[in-house]
């Protein structure tokens, strides 16, 4: 068997598939798909909040792995505790000569974490702003956009109709979105929530039990959400129930809903990416990092960023994509898929080179 055919033992960190979110689940699906295409076998996939530093068995598996992948989604900013944990992982891998790659990541407002950035074998960030932040501390990175954008959606031929409004990870923004929907009869609220998948074979025995508990808890919340009314001025305790009340649980149905709508107004990054994937016109509001602004700048859609839901709704008659925007989006998605595939090929090549007899 040639070196290029040897299967690589990979460990994945920050598996977000249990986070009740269509975007997170699609990211993980794409990571497993792209890794498999280049001969990476992800033997263990570490849940988002599992601490590798207290898991002796996992540390042993790290030292025996051919490479480690860190999904930076939602973590590598503001010196967050999870960010520092993955920075320490990169340092640990470096000490034990295990290639460690950061993928699918933002990088913003870090100080302590910057000290560990150079420990990653290579960093692949989602946007040019993150690349610039790393360059400011002397660390090079490559830009590969969010991995949801590498997903190829089969568009339906049905006519688009209806406007969808989605909230934000920021509660104040979500409340603003809900007030806007309640004031208009022509708007439909939709949540990006979904159920945690039931899954086995990811190298952590508690995965199935954990996700089963999460599913049962979520199903109870979904059922309860239908027994509440949701006034325009929504009390904070009802925010979680609102998200479940307007969830579309199937990713396939959710993407088809986007694909049938005339447009979407959202403050969530992954709903922006899924609008791009489904070819759905949208207006976006800023989120908790620069991720939305940076993505829109990359695609050439910076003018689709709006300061408020009210202003976005007032501009809804101009939400349709222009021909030049459609061309830019098509080119961007094609390039993104190529970049994602090239990123995994490069990581596999580096790991194989590091595992040749004269290197290990």
Model regions: which residues?
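Active-site anion-handling motifs in enzyme catalytic cores
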Residues: 1-360
């Amino acid at each position: 068997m040639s070196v290029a055919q040897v299967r690589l033992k990979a460990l994945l960190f920050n598996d977000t598939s249990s986070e009740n979110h269509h975007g997170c689940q699609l990211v993980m699906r794409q990571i497993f798909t792209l890794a498999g295409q280049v001969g990476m076998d992800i033997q263990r996939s570490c849940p988002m909040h599992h601490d590798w530093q207290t898991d002796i068995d996992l540390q042993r598996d790290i030292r025996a792995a051919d490479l480690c992948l860190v999904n930076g989604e939602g973590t590598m900013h503001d010196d967050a505790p999870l960010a520092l944990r993955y920075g320490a992982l990169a340092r640990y891998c470096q000490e034990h000569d295990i290639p460690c790659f950061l993928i699918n990541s933002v990088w913003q407002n870090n100080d302590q974490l910057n000290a560990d950035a150079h420990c990653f074998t290579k960093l692949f960030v989602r946007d040019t702003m993150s690349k610039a932040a790393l360059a400011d501390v002397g660390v090079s990175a490559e830009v590969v956009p969010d991995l949801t954008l590498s997903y190829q959606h089969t568009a339906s031929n049905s006519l688009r109709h209806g406007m969808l409004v989605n909230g934000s990870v920021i509660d104040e923004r979500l409340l603003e979105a809900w007030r806007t929907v309640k004031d208009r009869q022509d708007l439909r609220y939709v949540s990006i929530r979904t159920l945690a998948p039931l899954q086995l074979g990811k190298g952590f025995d508690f995965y199935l039990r954990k996700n089963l508990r999460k599913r049962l808890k979520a199903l109870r919340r979904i059922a309860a959400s239908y027994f509440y009314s949701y006034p325009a001025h929504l009390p904070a305790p009802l925010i979680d129930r609102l998200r479940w009340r307007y969830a579309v649980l199937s990713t396939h149905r959710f993407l088809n809903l986007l694909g049938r709508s005339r447009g979407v107004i959202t403050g969530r990054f992954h709903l922006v990416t899924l609008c791009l994937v489904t070819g759905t016109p949208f207006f976006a509001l800023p989120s908790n990092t620069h991720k939305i602004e940076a993505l829109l700048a990359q695609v050439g859609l910076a003018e689709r960023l709006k300061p408020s839901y009210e202003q976005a709704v007032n501009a809804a008659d101009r939400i349709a994509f222009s021909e030049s925007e459609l061309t830019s989006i098509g080119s961007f998605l094609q390039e993104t898929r190529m970049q994602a595939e090239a990123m995994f090929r490069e990581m596999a090549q580096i790991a194989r080179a590091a595992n040749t007899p004269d290197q290990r």
